[in-house]
């Protein structure tokens, strides 16, 4: 079936704008003026009036946690109840009371940020959660996902005591010689054996919920790190859940799996069983090896080359030794895998660059597209190394909304002066894609576009390093064609052009004609996947 979409301002990804386009068999057939498209239509052509909307390629969130988003949607969502510690605890107690069927089981919540608490400028602790309940285990995850707090019941279940040794790459919070309920990074894995994992049907429901939210923000493609969401669930089950949803026609987002592995034996089995081989389908593909290099800036676990300016007793930490990271990256590179490694602190970035440089020296590859996820705190010498190694950058411009308030106080003026330098890297020839790291942030693309263009927070704080601001075109491209480049899909996705997948988003206003500080107010009218509407406001 041939369909004509008309009466629109169409940003194709090229320099010029169009008015209309034709779609046939899930792909763009032609793009041009309305007159040109009418000449290619006949009596059987279906016509869709886009009512003057702004059309761009479907948004591509190049790093997020899709299953994690689905899990949050089925848990206590704390992000809108973090104005104070007392408010968050009241909401958590009310949530538990409203879900009596869950009492006696684990109570999960996510989204809090202690920097927003008006009544207590500190992390919650076990005593705070014990006030909600000690009858059942409670775990609340900080927005960043690199720190959680549990109550006494959860600590007892996991056997975490004053004598428990934290695993490498993690930390157990202590107060007066006893665990205070705070667990950082790899220490959170101590809970894994005691949390009942979801079954495949529950995973599928999480994916359905998450896809609906992504579509509502105009997102039609997601590059997702799912395997780490529930460590007790094997990667085969995640893959089966996605492929069954694809087969039933319920997968409304094109997914590229950033395959998270922490050990060489697990990665080796994944590769030897052929899980990372082949192109996959147009809806579900296996992408790079994904690893977490360090923690987060907000929790002060990102690994810096010097101590934190506002916590001189710590510089954060890397989650793995340099030797282990080198082995993982070298194995993946030698077997044709792309790698994407989370690095927020500059000391962690040093390790990532060392590992990639070693791997490419051992097994050179012309178009490896190895990448750094986040790439936030950096030094000028590292920006040059990134360019020399031709790294892909998975940026999250939306992080500036919060980080504008903390980066200078956290890392000091010297490091802050060369951080979040994504425009510099782009001008140096690197491909910079954009994303949300959802559920760390909402997958709100237009909010991310505004942060990229203004370098300001939503409350007006900033601009932070305004010379690093993107143009509107660069910002839109970072959420479309650059995302496709991250996954080697730029030949058929990320543009509105003949032969490309007919994934597009319709906005209610033109970003090129919108005042920069109002970009976040632009709404999504509809989202289309392969020419089929998957969301309509």
Please report, for each region that a protein language model flagged, where it lies by residue.
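Conserved catalytic core of nucleotide polymerization and phosphodiester-bond processing enzymes
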Residues: 522
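His/Asp/Glu-enriched, well-ordered alpha-helical/loop segment
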Residues: 330-340, 344-370, 375, 380-384, ...
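Non-cysteine beta-strand/loop elements that form the S-adenosyl-L-methionine
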Residues: 65, 281-301, 391-401
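Short loop/turn motifs at secondary-structure junctions and domain boundaries
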Residues: 11-15, 281-282, 485, 516-519
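Beta-rich accessory regions
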Residues: 530-532
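Acidic (Asp/Glu)-rich catalytic clusters
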Residues: 246-248, 274-281, 365, 386-388
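Divalent metal-binding segments
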Residues: 2-7, 13-272, 291, 296-331, ...
